Amino acid sequence: EKLKEKGDIALVRENDKDYILIPDVATYIQASGRTSRLYPGGVTKGLSIIIVDDQRLLNGLKKRMKWLYEDFDIKALEEIDLDKIMREINEERARVKKILSGEIEVEKAVELTKTALLIVESPNKAKTIASFFGKPSIRQLNERLVAYDVATGRYVLSIIASIGHVYDLAVKVGEYGYGVLRENGLFIPVYTDIKRCVKCGYQFTDELDRCPIRECGGEVTRKLDVIKVLQDLATEVDVVLIGTDPDTEGEKIGWDLKVLLEPYAREIKRIEFHEVTRRAILEAINKPRDFDMRLVEAQIVRRVEDRWLGFALSEIAQKYFWAEYCITKLHEKLLKLMKRSKQLTDLPDCCEKNMNFSAGRVQTPVLGYIIERFRDQHDPEKYKYYVLIGVNESIIRLEVNRDVFLNIREKLREGEEVTSYVKVVGLKEEEVNPPPPFTTDTLLEEASMRLGLSSTRVMEIAQDLFELGLITYHRTDSTRVSDAGIAVARACLEEKYGDKYKEYFKPRTWGAGGAHEAIRPTRPIDPDRLRQLVREGILVLVRPLTRQHYEVYRLIFERFIASQMKPARIVKQELEVKVNGLSAKVERVVGATDKGFLEIYPEYLEVEEEVKEGEYPIVNVIEVKPPLARFHDVIKWMKTQGIGRPSTYAKIVQTLLNRRYVELTPKQKALKPTDRGVLVYNRLIELFSDVVGVEVTRRLEEKMKEIEEGKRDYQDVLRELFEELKVKIKENMEVIKKLEERYMEYCGGIKV
């Protein structure tokens, strides 16, 4: 019966046997593809006419085709101008015939078809895009670079990946050797190609043949090799299309590529897409734009500021803070060695720079927040106290003061029965709207809470899902939903509820217009269907999906579909709970008269059992310390404070872990500061609070935004930042003197 209700497969009975008829998508693609042909002028127009003898199978064909091609549609014959289409087909075929017979020269025919080089950042993304246009020709250009050649109709396209950034600021040039020159009142950043250690992955810009990390010394690859390949390819094509990510960082990578390829290319255009789908790629190719120099300038300022402040503070941390930490931390060990008359072999190392110490404008306040949460856990004034009341199979948790907590705890320890009285005030009904779809910070928060994943891992998974064409761009602070997104939600709800889908569907844009969108699925494929399509080989992805990929996709899918559904109507029970002379109001969600979006997203609200009035036992009392910060707490705090960006949320936390300033607790996976982290933070706040504080960091983010919006000149901001660097750090003699005096206390008698 359920199969009959689906409306996209047919159940028939012939010769006393039952059959299930399912549309054959692969055969349809193959057959309809024969109506078009590739020729020197492009791809001929084709027409596929389907004679329908069972509407259910047509519905099934349309649904299954949309799984593979999100913009696929079938139109009724009366909706199109058949004569016009046939005329265009016949004219085009006559043209092909003339080309083949030699009446039209091939060179003239190909004028309509251009060759293009499409550069994206990721090899997986390049491979995914190529798969949209048939089976590509593959060219292995060197050990790392592969080009995929396909035909899109308008273009013969070579698709290749730059593999991320190609250039970064040089070192040992400019003011303080930080890679920025000052000439005629202007700041000129000096860039060079990035080098990367094959062994440990360390990236740098020094002109070195081996990895500079002492313990490694591995072989090095350099982006100059990538650039040379791209320059050669640029000479072969009519136009270079740069399709790097649609954010400030992507704009800067694209601009670097433009500058490097300009002497070799006839024409260079920027294309922008927010999802890796066939429709989005074709739209972007057909609507190229110029580079947004405001975004490029904002990213230049971000990188220069990061270099200036990061290098200046890190140099101090690597020498002065490391020496203090190392010697004070090893003090006990050194005393033991002295008692045994052993040489202090550890001490000289304490007085050499430790390159794993660093500091930065954003990471410092984030470290401070983690430390504050740790200190709160050890502050009795921040503790909370609860009594747990046993109500049938559930628990009512009621907050009480410390005196009540101690009194009841003593009674329970002595074996006394302690009760509470629960009075039912009444029931009330409320309407609850669904939450908006995910932004970067809310996705990181949800995945951390529900899946226990680190922010770095979530961003890796989201990057994979984006590059595979399964979700929209994942570095976003927008909740906006496009018409294409609303269409995805409609199709999913229609699949789930059939003709009744309109009862559940309530489309919302969740924000004003703009380029950026919320994180959402790109196609109407639910998580279970995705797993099935991949398993059966119907949906072929360029890399395998893990269990965690499916889990994160489920979060994104359910949150998005819920955001396009009607509100829920829930029932709340109001209670008055009396304990030990105290009285408190308690509300519990006990049901729903209309589940609405909770049908898809039940985790949003916890539904508990309805309570009857009466006396109930207190089964326990608990003392709750403020919890340590977890990944989602840090991300939420950064968002609230206005520091950091979607592209840096995960990186900041990972940097603190890499520097061993914080560590993960084994069970809770919470963030706990280490001794070295506390020392570095304390010294930074003591000496540079006006540089690394929350407020000054937030103001800098606002300045970056003003540059992006064209409200501030980026050179003016660079001048302000340089003055800050000079006055407050590099030439702050009071601070330098204090640092040197401390250093001499620890290392003055040691020859290094």
List where the protein language model places each region.
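Non-catalytic, charged low-complexity extensions flanking SF2 helicase motor domains
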Residues: 49, 53-54, 70-105
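Intrinsically disordered, low-complexity regulatory segments
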Residues: 108-315, 321, 365, 606, ...
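Long, highly charged, low-complexity internal segments
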Residues: 154-159, 166-192, 199, 347-467, ...
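Conserved segment of the helicase C-terminal RecA-like domain
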Residues: 3-9, 21-30, 34-65
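C-terminal or mid-to-C-terminal helical accessory/interaction module adjacent to the motor/catalytic core
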Residues: 78-86, 100-105, 111, 208, ...
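Short hinge/gating elements
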Residues: 12-18, 46-50, 112-116, 198-199, ...
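Accessory beta->alpha helical hairpin/"wing" motif in late/C-terminal subdomains of nucleic-acid enzymes
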Residues: 472-498, 651-688
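Leucine-rich, amphipathic alpha-helical/linker segments
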Residues: 499-522, 690-736
